[in-house]
Amino acid sequence: MPRSFLVKKHFNASKKPNYSELDTHTVIISPYLYESYSMPVIPQPEILSSGAYSPITVWTTAAPFHAQLPNGLSPLSGYSSSLGRVSPPPPSDTSSKDHSGSESPISDEEERLQSKLSDPHAIEAEKFQCNLCNKTYSTFSGLAKHKQLHCDAQSRKSFSCKYCDKEYVSLGALKMHIRTHTLPCVCKICGKAFSRPWLLQGHIRTHTGEKPFSCPHCNRAFADRSNLRAHLQTHSDVKKYQCKNCSKTFSRMSLLHKHEESGCCVAH
């Protein structure tokens, strides 16, 4: 930084600031109007016109707060802060006043809410019940999650098949099902139709003799991948299909059926 911008300021460390010379400003906000004690008033038309609250009085002075109160008035137990003390509103009865000043009775719902707020244990003991299935929950969040299930079920659309009576929750599932009726994949060699393209490809290999899926354990090859997976089970050590007559085990159910149909082991 250039030296022309530097300002040298002498500070006297021995001189301490006198905080008693500073004025203290205490702002007191109260919903009550002390008519016998004249004070500056901040006009607030929206409050004064309603008639529900008295004008807001403001003290700005360096004297202590207790010295400002009129005779016969003492500070009430309110909310303490650095700005002063705010007196609480008077206790309310079972009736309330509207903006016109007339009394209107409190509804049953408001009275029930006030009684619950005064007793925290009443909220915990209350059961939240679903108005659709009468199922109860101990918390409101649990009831809200349960009602979401009702909303999802009601908003869920069902798509019906025009060829049969089946219904699906998604349009994509319905389109896949309709292909089983229309069979759009047709073999050009024999005219056989299929619902899926990969089924047609596996069928065409039966005409061409192509067997691209070979077994890594033996020299057998297959035209379809699913046939290879079934063949690999014969090389597995796990053989969970057992013959009831000779207790011989097999890795595939189809091999067990062939064994039973051959009649090699007849029960005596």
Curated annotation (Swiss-Prot):
Zinc finger residue ranges, C2H2-type: 128-150, 159-181, 185-207, 213-235, 241-264
One Pfam assignment: zf-C2H2
Keywords, alphabetical: Cytoplasm, Deafness, Developmental protein, DNA-binding, Metal-binding, Nucleus, Repeat, Repressor, Transcription, Transcription regulation, Ubl conjugation, Waardenburg syndrome, Zinc, Zinc-finger
Post-translational note: Phosphorylated by GSK3B. Once phosphorylated, it becomes a target for ubiquitination.
Disulfide bond residue pairs: none
GO cellular component: chromatin; cytosol; nucleoplasm; nucleus
Clinical note on disease: Waardenburg syndrome 2D: WS2 is a genetically heterogeneous, autosomal dominant disorder characterized by sensorineural deafness, pigmentary disturbances, and absence of dystopia canthorum. The frequency of deafness is higher in WS2 than in WS1. Piebald trait: Autosomal dominant genetic developmental abnormality of pigmentation characterized by congenital patches of white skin and hair that lack melanocytes.
Entry similarity comment: Belongs to the snail C2H2-type zinc-finger protein family.
Domain notes per entry: Repression activity depends on the C-terminal DNA-binding zinc fingers and on the N-terminal repression domain.
PANTHER family cross-referenced by the UniProt entry: ZINC FINGER PROTEIN (PTHR24388), ZINC FINGER PROTEIN SNAI2 (PTHR24388:SF42)
Protein name: Zinc finger protein SNAI2
Gene expressing this chain: SNAI2
